[in-house]
Design a protein with these regions (language model features):
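Histidine (H) residue identity feature
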Residues: 67, 114-116, 129
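Conserved small/polar residues in nucleotide/adenosyl-binding loops
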Residues: 128-134
Length: 138
């Protein structure tokens, strides 16, 4: 199944954090990173008193079902040092399952397409890059 995963960070070495998150996906079993978007700097949403975010999106293919893929993302976040102090607060890494092919999922733990996909300004541009024939490096 193909997935679009949004990745963001606004703590520490933001570019290195993005690279580490992509690498975590590359290391995941039964999962291949197909394409990476460019990196975008965006303002925080919800809680403004924090550093701007670096964001990108990754197109990957995996044998895992959506809830399992969410688990991979959450595990990668934990492994990269994510601590959830408060909603919309600063974070070393954030990995969101934005799309899972044409699936529509509404469960307590997972909503796909991601419920805030329209509010994230980097998502449409990143998605466009992911569907272009050229490879962009993160």
């Amino acid at each position: 199944m193909k997935y679009v995963i949004g990745i963001g960070t606004n703590m520490g070495n933001r570019l290195e954090n993005l690279k580490n998150a992509v690498y975590a996906l590359e290391l995941a079993p039964k999962t291949a990173v197909i394409k990476k978007s460019a990196v975008y700097e965006t303002s925080p949403v919800g809680y403004a008193k924090q550093q701007d975010f670096y964001n990108c999106a990754v197109l990957c293919e995996s044998a895992f079902e959506p809830h399992e893929m969410l688990g991979i993302c959450l595990g990668a976040e934990c492994g990269l040092g994510r601590v959830r102090n408060f909603k919309n607060g600063p974070r070393v890494i954030d990995m969101d399952l934005l799309l899972a092919e044409d699936k529509i999922i509404r469960t307590p733990n997972l909503i796909v397409p991601h419920p805030h996909i329209k509010e994230r300004l980097f998502v449409p541009v990143s998605y466009t890059h992911l569907t272009l024939p050229t490879k962009l490096e993160v």
